[in-house]
């Protein structure tokens, strides 16, 4: 959520920034929220005048009573003032509700570093690692490799649940588990993150806090009778871990890593990478989340991105890093990098991680602040997160980039200790 004071003082700048985003945004709501804000502030002035008058009148009552004078007119005046204040308070509550409704639907403002552009074709490659994998045979898609090795079963998952689910079987299940353990061990032991195992369901307030609601409710799986939501990413519960709290400045940056299953309806994604493991309704992911001071956040974003890159380098999977343009930035991020791995069957790079700085956008929604010391005024933290990285897509990338002509798949060296020393899946 944006700072209302920032909108008030820089409305034209805010409108221009919102106009530059890819998704068409009705900037007239900025004028609407400013009108409501002005109305609210005018009423607050009136309320303060009335309260001052009520206090003044009230202070006269004891003296007049002591003198034996009739105070019924004064008491009646106090009652009228209180009723008038009560009416204004009710009006303020309605105005606050309208302002909140609008503010929750205004996207974040892109950082000046974000390049211009309208679609993912306008994203800018920052760096890459390893050349795309070459084969002297026709490479297979990961869903065919997994099916042929009897380690992935999409057909039976379709029978049991529906499309875009899978069973991992045998060494496929072990490979998934190995990747999860390797990622968690790397981020906790080498990169200094504190591990969290979060709930897989959250309440509506949590989804609002990280920006999934109200805009993206159709993409979420909802437990209607309880108003709970299955988490689309561990970012939601981990960020909300500190909702409505004031952290200590010397604790920052706080770094958490969390493995979780993730659940997404992927509404509107029909036909886009819907075969195999790339775009499933349920998938596993290791998430990196940071809480920082504002002046630290962009340095910490670079570190977080490098942490996510490390596991791809050690796995030996070709990848690149792209800076996301304004039109592809999404609702909550101020600046975002995507890590994309090479997928031979697609003959292109596929996103495996998004690393974002939200600045104070989520912190304002979730009311997460910090104080430098006990006497300091609380300030909003900056929140960051990134996949460290998506598990199913990592398995897909391993199957495709490490496939052999005989149909087997070589296991990356860093995963072999987690696979009982096995060197290949045959």
Curated annotation (Swiss-Prot):
Q: Output the InterPro entries linked to this UniProt entry.
A: aa-tRNA-synt_IIb, aa-tRNA-synth_II, aa-tRNA-synth_II/BPL/LPL, Ser-tRNA-ligase_type_1, Ser-tRNA-synth_1_N, SerRS_1_N_sf, SerRS_core, tRNA-bd_arm
Gene Ontology molecular function, alphabetical? ATP binding; catalytic activity, acting on a protein; serine-tRNA ligase activity; transferase activity
Pathway membership, UniProt? Aminoacyl-tRNA biosynthesis; selenocysteinyl-tRNA(Sec) biosynthesis; L-seryl-tRNA(Sec) from L-serine and tRNA(Sec): step 1/1
Enumerate the residues binding L-serine.
233-235, 287, 387
Record SUPFAM superfamilies: Class II aaRS and biotin synthetases (SSF55681), tRNA-binding arm (SSF46589)
Q: Which domain of life is it from?
A: Bacteria
Q: Which catalysed reactions does the entry list for this protein?
A: tRNA(Ser) + L-serine + ATP = L-seryl-tRNA(Ser) + AMP + diphosphate + H(+); tRNA(Sec) + L-serine + ATP = L-seryl-tRNA(Sec) + AMP + diphosphate + H(+)
Identify the residues that bind ATP.
264-266, 351-354
Q: What is known of its domains?
A: Consists of two distinct domains, a catalytic core and a N-terminal extension that is involved in tRNA binding.
| Assembly and binders | Homodimer. The tRNA molecule binds across the dimer.
Against PANTHER family, the record matches this protein to:
SERINE--TRNA LIGASE, SERYL-TRNA SYNTHETASE
The task this protein performs is described as: Catalyzes the attachment of serine to tRNA(Ser). Is also able to aminoacylate tRNA(Sec) with serine, to form the misacylated tRNA L-seryl-tRNA(Sec), which will be further converted into selenocysteinyl-tRNA(Sec).
So what family is this one in? Belongs to the class-II aminoacyl-tRNA synthetase family. Type-1 seryl-tRNA synthetase subfamily.
- Listed name of the protein: Serine--tRNA ligase
* Species for this entry: Clostridium botulinum (strain 657 / Type Ba4)
Q: What is the lineage of its organism?
A: Bacteria, Bacillati, Bacillota, Clostridia, Eubacteriales
Gene name, per UniProt, is serS
